[in-house]
């Protein structure tokens, strides 16, 4: 049968389905669709024109089977190759009570039969503003029984009536007409998934028409859980050789959908009758093969998209060998460090002193030695003499450093097994070098570590890095909201998972406004009273109707003069993959209207044993303060 099943785009192949409104012979049709290269078939579970009666006699008791037998296909084929479709006459939100009640019963009958067949997914239409009863019937179905189907809501990218020329002037306006026409369908979807309490089993099948909305509307859709994209054959153009192709704008949208690994569904009749129907699918394959290749960062991050990880706590915990190994593979970070040390050595030691002036370098938090090697390479490149101390608190990593020293470094490097804050240095350093930054700059306690070590830096000494700044940006992402919600632990407060940050490769999300600087730290810190607690207020203008789910955190650091590292999207160091962004979630999604401002308050707090963040949204509405007193998350000193 078909090569693949619903639910996965294996490798680089496009996963695709054929949408049909009527299937007289199911086994024959499935065979023909598979022969054309499609992986699954979308079809009605009941005959689309068979209106069942559930209320009135005698039609209510009409004899005979309601639909065809499940024995026409094997259980495996039902499980993997068929996506069910709701009959088009079912209208659970009809204002006519008889139609509504009949529709409710018919909808449950079809959903239950789909569950009985074990269908992997079921398509339901969202084609009007009010879908409240549809949401109730579906939610009740999800919460009863032990089935595991996904429910794909078929939502048009642009509402069909917005394309009509005959819209009646001065007609009474409905609620959603306070939104622009091209935003209507997103509002339908947002209200629907809110009514369904963000169920992970409800996703979007986005129907793409000939006309596309503006980029910000498309951007917002790409933060939604899109599982499928429905492409009508009518949107395809014809090239010189008679083959179906898409406009440049549509191609760009397809490239973005391919990144989300959506499945494509072709619907409609063959508009290119000289060509086989499979030519539509072949064109999608062609686009997939010719999309821009992934960069080094995307290749490294493959498989980690939207996967939540707890931030490392290298001060409190000793890292494992594999963790060091991953970070050491970064091609950019250490070359930037080498360049910074090289420049610093040239600035500190004039040419005429290069044979007599020996610079004392201390690598604080040496790990398995990558910064020591970068320092030695920089000294060689600059033709300057250095004396190195490699200070590391993890006794397991010290074994690696001592082996390096024995086999490679020799007496030029002194390995010190100690916490840098407690070490009594035999001399003062000209340069201290460290890589203590986390995804939010200071979240691995670089300020506390370097402040505790700066007493053994000379008065004119240099710290590499010399400065770092965290950044925040508001984001919308159903996927991440649901991932955080699923992190609930048995013995903790039921909302504790919303009061802690996560390191995550952001993928299925929409950034609502440009990142803004949050906290800045400089080294050496010459303040007479050093205090690393911080408080900032950030205001983000939002130009689109949307929903806020949390904040993405980034950082930039100045290693030395003009040598920098950054994970802020606008200035991201090309090819660097040592850090994924950080996510600060919020407990309750907040609806934001176009033109409103999101105001967030962020605190960095500490006591003698730990550091933590607190955060709260104060506009357009107030949230609770998250993580007060560090009750859900702290970073151990």
UniProtKB/Swiss-Prot annotation:
Q: Does the keyword Transcription regulation apply?
A: yes
Annotated catalysed reactions: L-arginyl-[protein] + 2 S-adenosyl-L-methionine = N(omega),N(omega)'-dimethyl-L-arginyl-[protein] + 2 S-adenosyl-L-homocysteine + 2 H(+)
Q: Where does S-adenosyl-L-methionine bind?
A: 324, 333-334, 392, 419-420
Catalytic site:
435 (proton donor/acceptor), 444 (proton donor/acceptor)
> Region (Beta barrel) spans which residues?
465-637
Which of the residues bear the PTM N-acetylalanine?
A: 2
Residue ranges of every copy of the SAM-dependent MTase PRMT-type domain listed in the record: 308-615
User: One Pfam family of this protein, by short name?
Assistant: PRMT5_C
Instruction: Identify the stretch(es) annotated as Dimerization.
Output: 488-494
Enzyme Commission number(s) from the entry: 2.1.1.320
The cross-references to PROSITE patterns, in alphabetical order and at most eight, read: SAM_MT_PRMT (PS51678)
Where this protein primarily resides, as one coarse class? cytoplasm
Report keywords, A-Z: Acetylation, Biological rhythms, Chromatin regulator, Cytoplasm, Golgi apparatus, Methyltransferase, Nucleus, Repressor, S-adenosyl-L-methionine, Transcription, Transcription regulation, Transferase
One Gene Ontology term of the molecular function aspect: methyl-CpG binding
A Gene Ontology biological process in which this protein takes part is: circadian regulation of gene expression
Q: State the family it belongs to.
A: Belongs to the class I-like SAM-binding methyltransferase superfamily. Protein arginine N-methyltransferase family.
User: Which purpose does this protein serve, as stated in its record?
Assistant: Arginine methyltransferase that can both catalyze the formation of omega-N monomethylarginine (MMA) and symmetrical dimethylarginine (sDMA), with a preference for the formation of MMA. Specifically mediates the symmetrical dimethylation of arginine residues in the small nuclear ribonucleoproteins Sm D1 (SNRPD1) and Sm D3 (SNRPD3); such methylation being required for the assembly and biogenesis of snRNP core particles. Methylates SUPT5H and may regulate its transcriptional elongation properties. May methylate the N-terminal region of MBD2.
What is the name attached to this protein's record?
Protein arginine N-methyltransferase 5
**Taxonomic lineage of this organism?**
Eukaryota, Metazoa, Chordata, Craniata, Vertebrata
